[in-house]
Every structure is written in structure tokens, then in C-alpha cells.
């Protein structure tokens, strides 16, 4: 057994002194004081820090199989554990794509061998993510895939998405969509706006995203499918999603930390660590995302952790791949910028990473109570640390946040009662 002493948990937004007794994989007792006298109890001192439920990230890229030079299941899940995440859902833009039962089983075998946290894999919507032929939804649903997505590309035709949603509704699985109309991206490498004009870099307009969301919410209404929108980035998208929810359509949405924190004006020049898809938008868009998150239009936060090799990101923005890493920095950045400055409560931020994503995807994680799995993270809210690439457990360090000083860093993460990350003393 393990006993976590000298910790604090959130109860209705208030920090309460708490001790947690863990028996095997599950929580046996949560109380302000636990009298457990046994020689076989391992005591973990939380040092007055927050004990939060293990975070749930419904959008990561682990790159394996096929992209191991960028990240592996092992390195990506070590990074997740360092960031406080105990459950991650990897996207299917791997080689091979998890578009058959055989490929999903091969992926699960790899996960069982090296993953440091719980990994719930997506299956693709279309074979090879090519957008021309649907996967076998029934067989893949029976195999227990998390949901269906072609993330990395948008499903380009309404007829294909309509057919996919009908199948997904039939097997009671969500469709998770990267929304991007290829006919409207114009080879862009950042947001189409004043900054892209100043830098002479082709831009992607807001409409490339919002047009596809508008199409898809109507298809979701027609099919009864649960439709989840990845990494919302524009004010128009927020408006469409808000209206869809008011109409009773089963739509949910996520936003990334970088779209909440940065805008096109933060792009210093031709620096590919600021290249992600969707791109950093205008400040008006960022404010709409913050409003949408707080009013419930956007349901949760997901990192879109997208590692790339250093030589890939050293290329100009027009040639470098899209994406930045985020697993190890997400909570500290948002805690520092929004909670410490009084814009959000600590309870709100923790919920965006735990109970909110778990609830919308019907996962029995993201909360701490008697008999639940002992998935948790201990977080130091008071010590400032600098984000340094040499501290990353990910194979990649492609992020614009290197050098930022942040609070709210996890010091220990536990999955099913086993420590999967502990800060070096």
C-alpha cells in the first residue's frame, strides 16, 4: 500500500488538506488524516502540494509506428507523465495507419510493451487517411478503438463525412475532426493576416476551418452522431459551435494551450517553432476562444502534442512540418498565465484537463474518489521553473515556449498506483 501525506485536493474550488491511501491500483481512502500503521506502507510526502486527478489528453501524436525519429510511444508517454497526464489518445497519422483490426492490434502490442501511461488509440475514418474509402467501423468499434478521426487532414467531401457519421452513430463512437478545407488553404504556413503579409509568408484564412465545421454540424444533426472538433482556432468556428449546441446538436470541442496564449503577432519572423495547424490566429480569435471556453462552447483543453525532429523544424516555415510539442508544458503555462493572474480559478483549469475531457468521451477517469484508479499527479503551484529543452522527456523540443518561467509543474505522476514520473531531487 501507499500513503500520500501532506497534500491538498480541490473540493468545490477550495484546497483542503488531504491524505490518500492507495491499495494496489485503486484508492482505498481519502481523508484529512489517515491513521495507517503498517510496515509495508510506502509513504509519499506531497510537501503541501496539490494532488489532482491524472490529466486526460484526447489529442496527441506519438508518431510510432513510422515516425520514430520524431517520437516513440515510450518517449511520448514519458513526456505525458511529466506533464501530469495519465491518459492520452494518439492520432492515427502513423505508418501504417490504424485503419484495420490488424493494424490496431499491432499498435496495441507496441503500446503494451513501452507505454508509460494509459494509451487509448484512435482509428482512422478513411483507409490510409486518403479520404476515398471508409474503414470498417463495425469491426474497429468491436476492437475497442477510442473514436474515429483522420486528424492531420480534413475529410474533404460532404458525402464521405456523411457516410462516416452514419457509421459512427451506428456503432456509438464519436467522429473527431481536424477541420480544414484544402481548397481554401492556398499553401499557407501561418494565419492569413497582417503579420503574414509583413513576413511575405503565405497564409491560411479563418474560413478554411470554419466552413468545414459549419458543414459537419449539419451532418451531425442529420445523423445523430457525436461530433468532436479538434483544436478550434477561429471566432467564426466558436460561433458555429455555439449555435449548434443551442440547436441541440451533439457537438463538442477542444482548444490547445498555444491558441489560448499566442497570436499571429507573436510570430517573430520565419521561425518554424511558431508553425502549427491550425495556425496562430488574430487576437480577436484568441479572445473568442477564451470566451468560448469559459461559457462552455468549447469543452476541454487538449495539447495537440506534435513532435518533430530538429532538422525538420530548422527549415523555413514554408517547408517545415506543422506542429509543436505540448505535453510537458500545457498545465504550467496555463496555470501561470490564467490562474495566477486571476482570470481563471484553479478548479476551472484542473477540470479542463480532467473531468471535462473524460465526461464528453464517457471515460471513467479524471476524478479522485474511493475505489477509483489511483491516477493522479502532484503539482507544485508555488515554485518557479524555466522551460528548458534539456529537461524534456520527449524526443523533440519544437516549441516557442522555451525560456518561459512557469509555476504549476508536476513533481510526481501516478498511474494505477504506480509512480510513472517523479521529479529529480
Curated annotation (Swiss-Prot):
Positions annotated to bind substrate: 61-63, 93, 277, 308, 322-323
Keyword line: Hydrolase, Metal-binding, Pyrimidine biosynthesis, Zinc
Pathway in which this enzyme or protein is active: Pyrimidine metabolism; UMP biosynthesis via de novo pathway; (S)-dihydroorotate from bicarbonate: step 3/3
Active site, per annotation: 304
Residues annotated as binding Zn(2+) 1: 59, 61, 151, 304
Cofactor: binding details: Binds 2 Zn(2+) ions per subunit.
Main function: Catalyzes the reversible cyclization of carbamoyl aspartate to dihydroorotate.
Family: Belongs to the metallo-dependent hydrolases superfamily. DHOase family. Class I DHOase subfamily.
Protein name: Dihydroorotase
Organism: Staphylococcus epidermidis (strain ATCC 35984 / DSM 28319 / BCRC 17069 / CCUG 31568 / BM 3577 / RP62A)
